[in-house]
């Protein structure tokens, strides 16, 4: 609302609709929050309550999806908590008629014309025609652009004035909703001005052409980093960054600002609903003292950051689907091939032992030297935390910790080159920031022979060409089903320990075939299925209650993160199904198809059929058919074991649940697919849902805020668990025991007496 207020206010004014802003944070509204959101989201609950208390006929809660990007190769979206605001607010205020919420998706990714369509969808609910909406939108957007131009002129003047000031000038960074509003910023700008220091808000500065770290896909992240880069060499301007406890984007953005600023001091103020005014005063005064000390030494030259000179390069070969991969040494100009080169080793972080070992075997079979990292341990997380701020999410710490554990071990050799594989995304989650963070952290650690090796989720990780992509998909689908079997055996086998040994022996043989005899995979898989089928069972999968684990993809698939939950539930006879990696890939394909269909509609009618988006769409649909074919082939071999729980997998079916009950399709994240798959599973006979996520994960908390009230209305058992890399604390174990009792009762005919006894052990 702060960034686009000219657009909103003029738009409704032109339509003859009176508008007003909230002025209070009503505590009754804050208390309605269904999850532990960040401070600004808590305030939003109270602000909406204030609007309702003041008699608003309608409340505008935009799904603020994206803005025009400052960067050429990456879009500019917003964090999941910001984007999902209208969806979890509707769940938090179930007593408010749905028609009082004005659903508006704000998206400029595909231009103003597409943005107008979304405004028309909203006004149609108010009985306002398209022509009137178009006129109002065009006038309002012109006012918005005029506002942007005016404030940039103010920024240019403010920058010029700051250079002439005798006293230091403070630039306030953050986000408009937490840095510039009195409800959220605890009067921090005033604390500087009352001491005689001038303030410049970050979003008026002329930073458009500033160079920042790659893949910065958050709109306000782009603005903050560009502002920081603009000001790092300004002798008289110093940064104060206002952030909030558990702010996921800032857990990485603050690292980037630290690397940008070098030795120049800047202040970070982390606020929440418990922050004390006196503590903020103390930090402001200390910062001003530090500035005075720094200014006396500002002519000292910062040391140049270390750079090992190695860059990973992946180049498409002509118009084909093949890629040429090599490591470029920018210092010596040497191009070091990755394929068929024992000197280069690809390191695969463990995200589920079966899938990681499979991908490692596939990569080796293609002529690359690859090593799958072992399952993480407590030591892994400790090593990571010794080299981080601790605010990063657990998956980033596990990937980093496994790499550093290897680099600090006897296996590490200086005569080798290591490619650390890090998959990336383009938001809105933090995953896409991992590789940027690792690259710069490794520079700080002065690692001489380590390079980051990236693939992108936007292409369903197919950059290495069709051969690898096909083998990877077989591995993903197979690993998902093998994980199902492994979990089912824990709950149903007469001797789970012996069953695990038989199972591991079987899948290891499959992995050996993948690496050394790829054509023998299906034969070896049939042998494995036959051996697994012989394992004695004390109960069938169908007779057991089933629980689906959804949530953030890394922790739900990482054995170190999720196994304690699985083992505790399996010991009570509950079959656990962990939502697969394949589900995520199908969702990525669904999102690609959805985006391509939008692009096709933007083409001129006579050219749509043969346009590039149309051709890409047909190609994608063929890929999807093939992926489903592989899944059916694997299932036909493994299903006779009787150990694969039946689960809804059709993505279109899942997304129907998502749209009907949770979020708009424009919200592209794990939120959409996990909420929909959980709801579909419960309606398909599951007895409970566990939503697992890293501590303070944006995705996990929004899923909790959406799914918990939906499940509560239907008396469905639901448990949300946040993983911090340690054993589950007693309070979570107690909640898990209560959840398991509810699961057994929901299934019906289950004896819960043993569970009650064990809960007291």
Name each region found by the language model.
Residues 1-761:
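An N-terminal assembly and electron-transfer interface module characteristic of large anaerobic redox
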